[in-house]
Amino acid sequence: MVTGVQTCALPILRRDFPEHFTLFQALPGVEARLSFEALITWQSTLMYRLRQVRRLLPFSPLLAGDRGWFELLPASGWSYHEELNYYEDLPVFYPATRINFNCTSQQMKGAVNQRVFDVPACGGFLLTDYRRQLENLFEPGREVICYHEEGEIPELVRHYLSRDAERERIAAAGILLLLCHTFAVYL
């Protein structure tokens, strides 16, 4: 479930896995406990993102990034592009892609990640998981599209793949990000 309201790992560990929480408490020192919590957060992010990406497979997505996808997904139903350079490749890639899909790291809780700014700023269309902070930065539904529940992903993808003009209008509205979200505005 995607609610935009995430909690840190420890309350969940205490509530749902008390035997593991006891082991966590027995770890020697703060460093070991922080490392354990980071591991849980990274693993939960991997599991979360993998669930979301699997919902895209009926649409034969292009996945860009490291080769780890080959270990996690079936061999067919998607294509691969190696990692893209942030400064040189992504500003060209984002607007050339019909739907840029984002699922935020679990460590972000209610905050958005950099992709939520980058895709609209480059003139790309963004489908992202809802986070509370989004409403302070964008007008969801006008500048970016959000899914609140995992089950919404296939229908939203189907909808926007079949409506070029609507998708392009939303992407164009997102470009206003360049005018509204600058260092001068926030300083």
Pin down the residues of each PLM region.
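Single conserved hydrophobic/aromatic residue that forms the stacking wall/gate
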Residues: 1-8
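Short glycine/serine/threonine-biased micro-segments
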Residues: 2, 63, 172
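Conserved phosphate-coordination/catalytic loops
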Residues: 4, 43, 47, 81-84
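Alpha-helix-centered segments that form part of catalytic cores
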Residues: 12-58, 64
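Loop/turn elements at helix/coil->beta-strand transitions in domains of secreted/extracellular proteins
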Residues: 59-60, 98
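Catalytic binding pocket for nucleotide-activated donors in carbohydrate/polymer assembly enzymes
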Residues: 67-187
